[in-house]
Design a protein with these regions (language model features):
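Short beta-strand segments that buttress and anchor functional surface loops
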Residues: 26, 70-74
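Core beta-strand elements of the Rossmann-like FAD/NAD(P) dinucleotide-binding domain
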Residues: 76-87, 91
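Short, hydrophobic/aromatic-rich segments at coil-to-beta transitions
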Residues: 66-71, 127-129
Length: 273
């Protein structure tokens, strides 16, 4: 729905008068990502999957060129186990190429890590009755209501350091504050921030120096006999990603019939309530 300048300011009186010329209102979903991930895992376990946390792949076993086993390290206890399978799916996000190295192969695509940072501030920092979205020179900035807080972000920058610890920098925080403060009536300061968090997007690599315009689409490939890799994608397409990756793996299973995918008709646990 198109909104006039006055209509936009009624919805978000915390915006500066002189930056608003109008607005567009639309409705979207709000997802608790941690709960969603746990629910997907619980659903998989209900269907027969074995789910392990604190587990790292530290080696792959090959017979000839075919991957036939994986060495798994329990990072809590230090114990190792070996898993055998007809086919392995490498769905490790920004660690995709680390698995390729363990297999001694080079995949048809590479994955670049793009760091995204968000800040969290109390709801009274901004007077608004809806989430807000602004266009920046590089991307977009979201101001999202979350309980008693606003989540504000994000950034989009290359990350070539420790993949397990994508730390937010003062420059990241200053970037977010500078852009949101261009729009809001009362400036938000570092002192208002109650939390900062960051993560890495696994982007299928292109030729551009910047990650901003790299494809968020996913890619699936059989990188070696017995090993299928999938990378890229996003939350909203996770079932399609899943289906494509499993379909590629099924093609590499020898001497066994595999039933068709049922993901498009299988609800997550609790969805029927």
């Amino acid at each position: 729905k198109h909104l006039s300048r006055a209509g936009t300011l009624r919805l978000a009186p915390g915006l500066k008068d002189d930056v608003v010329v109008g607005g567009v209102r639309y409705f979207d979903t709000l997802v608790d990502d941690a709960r969603h991930t746990l629910t997907v895992l619980r659903t998989a376990a209900e269907l027969g999957a074995v789910v392990r946390s604190s587990t790292q792949v530290v080696g792959l076993t090959k017979v000839g060129s075919r991957v036939v086993g994986a060495r798994l390290l329990d990072t809590d206890t230090g114990s190792e186990t070996t898993l055998s399978a007809d086919v392995f799916i490498n769905a490790t996000g920004v660690w995709t190429e680390e698995i390729h190295k363990l297999a001694g192969v080079t995949g048809p695509f590479t994955v670049r890590a793009s760091k995204g940072v968000h800040i969290v501030v109390p709801r009274d920092c901004l007077d608004a009755d809806a989430a807000l979205c602004f266009v920046t020179e590089k991307s977009v900035l979201f101001v999202i209501p979350w309980g008693e807080y606003w989540i504000i972000g994000t950034t989009d920058t290359d990350w070539d350091k420790n993949l397990a610890y994508p730390a937010a920098t003062r420059a990241d925080i200053d970037y977010i504050l500078a852009h949101v403060n261009e729009k809001v009536r009362y400036p938000i300061t570092v002192a208002d921030i109650v939390s900062v968090y960051s993560g890495l997007r696994p982007l299928v690599s292109g030729t551009s120096e910047s990650t901003t315009n790299l494809s968020r689409n996913h890619a699936v490939a059989r990188v070696a006999p017995g090993l299928v890799s999938v990378a890229g994608g996003k939350y909203t397409t996770y079932r399609v990603i899943d289906q494509d990756a499993v379909a590629a793996a099924v093609q590499d299973i020898r001497g066994r019939m595999v039933p068709e995918s049922v993901t498009d008709t299988t609800p997550l646990l609790g969805a029927e309530r």
